[in-house]
């Protein structure tokens, strides 16, 4: 649904439908409708849904927040519930999908400390695809370095699904580490060394991680033995 044809009354009606839902199915369907509108006016309600015990509705809410994009970020950050693990986990997924740098600290913390492998996996992917181009050069470099550091530390994660996503995140981040910048060559070297370490890890339990690291290195034109 195009936001250009939605009036405030339309958005309010969609929000009220979510608030009035009296069954799991009703909540899911109402959330889907609100998410499909992708209107910033529905962001607060979608964030609220993240805290409900309804995974289907939460998935729809995350999709809606990602569709809204940057206008939803402040609402997500302001309303992250530190006492509701489920809501926070879904919020991490939304921030990872949006890719706004305002979510950097949350993604760093999630990759390093979250108890859920699926949340750490989402954070790893998110750290690799933050939208850095609009930033000033110095801020872009500093942000890329923070993403790199978090991902390098994530190489030691105990879950292979997270390590796999770290590989994806590192490969996605690589273009932001421009070799013509002062720190670029050293940062790229760290990134390549992290990928090589994952490729050569003799204790890796999941060969798919090694294969994905090899593919990333091949795409980067880096010899890895």
Predicted feature residues:
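Short terminal alpha-helical segments
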Residues: 12-19
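Intrinsic low-complexity, intrinsically disordered segments enriched in polar/basic residues
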Residues: 2-5, 99, 156, 190, ...
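Structural detector for internal amphipathic alpha-helices that build alpha-solenoid repeat scaffolds
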Residues: 1-6, 16, 24-39, 44-51, ...
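Conserved binding-pocket/active-site segment within a compact domain
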Residues: 129-132, 146-149, 154-159
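HEAT/HEAT-like alpha-solenoid repeats
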Residues: 86, 142-150, 183-196
């Amino acid at each position: 649904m195009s936001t250009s044809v939605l009036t405030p009354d339309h958005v309010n009606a969609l929000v009220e439908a979510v608030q009035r839902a009296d069954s799991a199915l009703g909540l899911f369907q109402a959330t889907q409708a609100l998410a499909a509108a992708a209107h910033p006016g529905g962001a607060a309600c979608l964030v609220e849904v993240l805290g409900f015990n309804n995974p289907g509705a939460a998935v729809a809410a995350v999709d809606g927040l990602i569709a809204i994009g940057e206008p939803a970020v402040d609402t997500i950050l302001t309303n992250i519930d530190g006492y509701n693990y489920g809501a926070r986990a879904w919020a991490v997924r939304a921030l990872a999908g949006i890719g706004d740098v305002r979510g950097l600290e949350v993604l760093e913390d999630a990759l390093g400390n979250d108890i859920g492998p699926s949340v750490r996996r989402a954070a790893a992917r998110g750290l690799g695809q933050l939208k850095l181009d609009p930033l000033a050069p110095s801020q872009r470099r500093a942000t890329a370095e923070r993403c790199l550091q978090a991902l390098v530390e994530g190489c030691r994660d105990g879950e292979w699904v997270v390590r796999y996503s770290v590989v994806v995140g590192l490969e996605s981040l690589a273009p932001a580490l421009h070799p013509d910048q002062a720190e670029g060559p050293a940062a790229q070297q760290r990134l390549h060394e992290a990928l090589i370490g994952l490729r050569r890890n003799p204790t890796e339990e999941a060969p798919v991680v090694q294969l994905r690291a090899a593919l990333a290195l091949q795409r980067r034109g880096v010899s890895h033995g």
